[in-house]
């Protein structure tokens, strides 16, 4: 699978990937998302923090979209807020699952988050099937 579009041309006013990353993060309007935080206990005795964006009125049968933030990201990252706004506009329930110690609260166990660990991701997805 190709990782780039070979005929992509950056706009003349925004050449290069760095500007294309910074401009949306710093200068684009951000939706006002009201999250409901949930502290979810993990099977190993630790916890994760989940920030839910749920439309009102909430439909318990609406799809759940799970978002895993990027490195040093959170539910307040511009891309997470945009995605959660798109979810609620469609009537879906969205959740940003913060990796261990990434939600503003240090975890109980010495196990830390790292990008290569998919066990927590799998557990989150399986657990969200119950919601």
Task: List PLM regions with ranges.
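Glycine-rich phosphate-binding loop signature in dinucleotide/nucleotide-binding domains
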Residues: 59-60, 131
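Catalytic nucleophile-loop/oxyanion-hole region of alpha/beta-hydrolase
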Residues: 86, 102-131
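N-terminal cap/lid segment of alpha/beta-hydrolase-fold proteins
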Residues: 19-58
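An amphipathic, basic-hydrophobic helix/alpha-beta surface used to engage anionic
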Residues: 81
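N-terminal presequences and immediately downstream first alpha-helices
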Residues: 1-28
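Conserved alpha/beta-hydrolase
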Residues: 76, 84-108
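Short beta-strand element of the alpha/beta-hydrolase
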Residues: 61-70
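Short strand->helix junction
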Residues: 72-74
């Amino acid at each position: 699978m190709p990782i780039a579009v070979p005929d992509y041309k950056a706009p003349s006013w925004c050449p290069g990937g760095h500007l294309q990353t910074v401009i949306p993060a710093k200068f684009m309007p951000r939706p006002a998302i009201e999250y409901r935080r949930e502290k979810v206990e993990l099977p190993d005795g630790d916890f994760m923090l989940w920030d839910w964006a749920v439309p009102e009125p909430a439909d318990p049968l609406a799809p759940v979209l799970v978002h895993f933030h990027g490195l040093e990201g959170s539910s307040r990252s511009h891309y997470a807020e945009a995605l959660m706004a798109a979810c609620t506009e469609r009537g879906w329930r969205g959740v940003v699952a913060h990796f261990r110690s990434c939600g503003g609260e240090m975890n109980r166990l010495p196990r830390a988050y790292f990008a290569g660990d998919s066990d927590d991701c799998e557990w989150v997805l399986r657990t969200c099937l119950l919601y």
